[in-house]
Amino acid sequence: VLDVWFDSGCTHRAVLENHPDLRWPADMYLEGSDQHRGWFNSSLMVAVATKSDAPYRIVLTHGFVVDEQGRAMHKSLGNVVAPEEVISQYGADVLRLWVCASDYSQDVRLGPEILKRLADAYFRFRNTIRFALGNLFDFEPEKHTVPYEQLTELDKFMLHRLAEIGDEVTEAYEEFDYPRVFQTLQRFCAVDLSAFYFDVLKDRLYCEAADDPKRRSCQTVIFEIAKALCTMLFPMISHTAEEAWQHLPNWQGKPESVALTDWILVPDEWRNERLAERWEQLLRIRDEVKRALELAKNERRVLNPLEAKVTLLTNESLADFLSGFNVSLSEVLIVSQVSVQTDEANLNAVPAEEFPNLSIAVELAPGEKCARCWQRQESVGQDSEYSDLCARCAEVVRKMRDS
């Protein structure tokens, strides 16, 4: 041994140039921050001296693992966290998620509270995928997929959001910005899916007829979301993504493993900025309605927002905007009934915070509560066979009985 640093600094010449499956220079040198004056430096000096070029295209450095207080881990302090203990308690994917969620550009903290938070984040990912898979139980992609032009506006909007998320995640992976990948996907699952899209879809998924075009429309999009989530999450939580992939509905040409599939491919038609702008404004109105519903619930004017009738008092311009959607506003707002008025006043209306020409009135919807969809509709009791169901649910149940 001439010198350990000189020997390690020569490895790129000894290994990369002499192995048929490798090439010089290396794509990346990856090591701790202490190697700037060590292996990175010695490799660079040897390469410049012998080949007049750097031996690597990229250098990526990371900090060291410390405890939750930022102290170095020592057995004497009793703060060492063994990977096998983490895997035994939480599973390998939570440990992988901790690595990806951490800012490796500085020292990385690890401890019981941090792992608990990451476990919570992991289960949010898992529950999101589980909801998607559970609602694809009767979906056969080659038989039930709805063409893009026949999807509802809401479903098209979610494909646009999926395209945006795919772009951001792809860029973050290419820049080795794994915390950004984690944050982007966590926000997508928690905000876009769980708190909005999946919540809105429950009526369509559970109450419409199995082959209703609106139900197949959202199943088509859920299928695309599930495939994309498996692909984008695979580098982080590989075991969970693979497990989910195996439970996806089969289709012709489905790769045996998510590891063998192509990276997410987004058709150009999914990208629709004009549609997205309209829906983002509608979502802001939805936030205003949720605030009014919460106030009505606190005042016990309604016990459950699903039983409410919402009246939107506004001007002609906003009324025209709201009438331009080919989706039921009651579905998006998750209430029984919605009315848009331009020429009435309501003393119980709550002024919107963001929209100066909008006030929102909330009251108990007229009619009776449907035993199946839980909405209050005036058609409940009108069907002689199913007197406790609304007209929509009675028709669906009758078709189920006769099929």
Outline where the language-model segments fall.
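Cys/His-rich metal-chelating microdomains
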Residues: 376-379, 393-396
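Short cysteine-rich clusters marking metal-coordination/redox-active sites
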Residues: 370, 390-393
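A glycine-rich helix N-cap at a beta->alpha junction
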Residues: 327-340
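Acidic, turn-prone loop/beta-hairpin segments
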Residues: 139-167, 198-292, 296-320, 339-342, ...
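Short metal-binding segments enriched for Cys and/or His
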Residues: 91, 396-403
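Short linker/helix segments within small regulatory modules
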Residues: 379-388
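Flanking scaffold residues of small Cys/His-coordinated metal-binding clusters
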Residues: 365-368, 385
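Structured secondary-structure scaffolds
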Residues: 1-139, 158-202, 220-233, 369-372
